[in-house]
């Protein structure tokens, strides 16, 4: 009932747009003047062209609008490449284990087949830049958050437009040859990466930690990495189902974005406390 209430209350407040091949929904605050903007990137299950699933698939964008009704919340939908979720996994299985963080596997986004490819996210950022030039958005307060494939999309988008964002939160970001390289060479944008202590993409944590260690050794104090514990996940009913196999537990733990969207450890407060060209609030 709570989920239905959130959908009914906020979904219709997201206006549908299609611009330069980008399908997106925008929550527009009633406040006058320049407002902050939060860009939300969905996961792999919400790709498509219906311009709706990115809102209803995980409710992430709706939760953000509920929390920050005085900000713009932008929720683009990544292209499907004419592949459904199961079809995508079948293609990935032919390349290797779809749940491994294999740096040798060419990700879909490199080939432009599906997801947050560089050309598409560049078009998304162009829309935001136009909103800034039109005086709608505060150029010093543009934020970025995404989950799973969208977490990898956060790293992709930062690499495409490093000057645009004040801070970002990649949640359980997919790790492949592209997203790992983007994290290794992360531009100077504050990021707080989160994931569950166990996740369905095995070795995800090892690659994230390896990249973070490199950044920390370079003096990047603006990079944070948190693994949610079993106890923290259980507070939100994640991983508590009786009789789960290890594979099923991994899959359930992948819902760790629920914690971030509930501001666990103050992660959302941390994100919006940043402003470009200013010290952290």
Residue spans for each PLM region:
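The conserved beta1-alpha1 loop
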Residues: 41-43, 195-196
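Primarily recognizes the serine-hydrolase "nucleophile elbow" in alpha/beta-hydrolase
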Residues: 129-134, 139-185
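Short, solvent-exposed loop/turn and secondary-structure capping segments
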Residues: 49-53, 84-89, 156-157, 180-183, ...
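Active-site machinery of serine-nucleophile hydrolases
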Residues: 37, 44-121
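A domain-start/cap signature at the N-terminus of enzymes
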Residues: 1-37, 71, 116, 120, ...
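C-terminal catalytic histidine-bearing segment of alpha/beta-hydrolase fold enzymes
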Residues: 194, 198-200, 206-209, 216-281
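Short, proline-enriched alpha-helix->beta-strand connector loops that line the catalytic pocket
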Residues: 69, 185-191
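Alpha/beta-hydrolase-fold catalytic nucleophile elbow
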Residues: 76-77, 145, 171-172, 194, ...
């Amino acid at each position: 009932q709570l989920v239905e209430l959130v959908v009914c209350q906020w979904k219709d407040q997201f206006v549908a747009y299609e611009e330069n091949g980008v399908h997106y929904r925008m929550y527009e605050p009633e406040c006058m003047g320049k407002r902050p903007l939060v860009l939300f990137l969905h996961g792999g299950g919400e790709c498509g062209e219906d311009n709706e699933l990115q809102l209803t698939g995980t409710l992430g964008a709706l939760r953000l609008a509920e929390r920050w009704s005085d900000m713009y919340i932008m929720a683009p939908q990544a292209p499907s490449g004419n592949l459904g979720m199961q079809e995508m996994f079948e293609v990935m299985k032919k390349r290797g284990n779809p749940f491994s963080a294999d740096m040798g596997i060419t990700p879909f986004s490199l080939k432009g087949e599906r997801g947050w490819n560089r050309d598409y996210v560049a078009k998304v950022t162009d829309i935001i830049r136009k909103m800034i030039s039109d005086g709608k958005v505060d150029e010093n307060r543009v934020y970025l958050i995404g989950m799973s494939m969208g977490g990898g999309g956060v790293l992709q988008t930062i690499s495409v437009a490093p000057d645009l964002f004040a801070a970002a939160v990649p949640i359980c970001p997919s790790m492949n040859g592209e997203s790992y390289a983007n994290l290794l060479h992360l531009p100077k944008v504050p990021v707080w990466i989160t994931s569950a202590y166990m996740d369905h993409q095995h070795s995800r944590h090892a690659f994230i930690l390896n990249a973070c260690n490199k950044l920390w050794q370079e003096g990047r104090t603006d990079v944070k990495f948190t693994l949610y514990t079993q106890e923290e996940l259980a507070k939100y009913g994640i991983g508590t189902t009786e009789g789960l196999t290890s594979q099923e537990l991994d899959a359930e733990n992948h819902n760790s974005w629920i914690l971030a969207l509930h501001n666990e450890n103050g992660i959302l407060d941390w994100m919006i406390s940043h402003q470009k060209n200013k010290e952290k609030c």
